[in-house]
Amino acid sequence: MTIVYLSLGTNMGDRAAYLQKALEALADLPQTRLLAQSSIYETTAWGKTSQADFLNMAYQLDTQLTAADFLKETQAIEQSLGRVRHEKWGSRTIDIDILLFGEEVYDTKELKVPHPYMTERAFVLIPLLELQPDLKLPPNHKLLRDYLAALDQSDITLFSAQ
């Protein structure tokens, strides 16, 4: 089994419902077991900032799927929940990013792991470190909390459904 860390985000429609539906679909993946989920955080948009706020969270799983097969499964979940890729960093019903896939490193057109922007995004690192505070980034094994210490965290708040 390979330990996998995911980041989930949404800024369209009923955001909390999209996260819940994505989690339910992830729970149904073959040869995969859900281990832990973070709290949900509300954040301003990153990259293209003129859009609605996001809800973000992290998930820890273990799987026997290959990284390529796991990516196909997560993309199928995104598509089933109405994800349309119009523009980079645009609004989305759901975004499921593979942050870490065990100690493996991938740099292909389809899959880049560790996720290339994760160390620049507090909205990724805060929920991820909630799951595993001593998590290290392969292959250099630098603590992820050291990256977080250098980032602005002022626009990230714990989400509470009203």
Curated annotation (Swiss-Prot):
Q: Which major enzyme category is it?
A: transferase
Q: Tell me its EC number(s), please.
A: 2.7.6.3
Q: Which Pfam families match?
A: HPPK
Query: Reaction(s) catalyzed by this protein?
Result: 6-hydroxymethyl-7,8-dihydropterin + ATP = (7,8-dihydropterin-6-yl)methyl diphosphate + AMP + H(+)
Keyword terms: ATP-binding, Folate biosynthesis, Kinase, Nucleotide-binding, Transferase
Q: Name one GO molecular function term.
A: 2-amino-4-hydroxy-6-hydroxymethyldihydropteridine diphosphokinase activity
PROSITE patterns in the cross-refs: HPPK
Known pathway: Cofactor biosynthesis; tetrahydrofolate biosynthesis; 2-amino-4-hydroxy-6-hydroxymethyl-7,8-dihydropteridine diphosphate from 7,8-dihydroneopterin triphosphate: step 4/4
GO terms for biological process, alphabetical: folic acid biosynthetic process; tetrahydrofolate biosynthetic process
**NCBIfam families, alphabetized:** folK
General function of this protein: Catalyzes the transfer of pyrophosphate from adenosine triphosphate (ATP) to 6-hydroxymethyl-7,8-dihydropterin, an enzymatic step in folate biosynthesis pathway.
Stated family: Belongs to the HPPK family.
In Swiss-Prot or TrEMBL terms, this protein is called: 2-amino-4-hydroxy-6-hydroxymethyldihydropteridine pyrophosphokinase
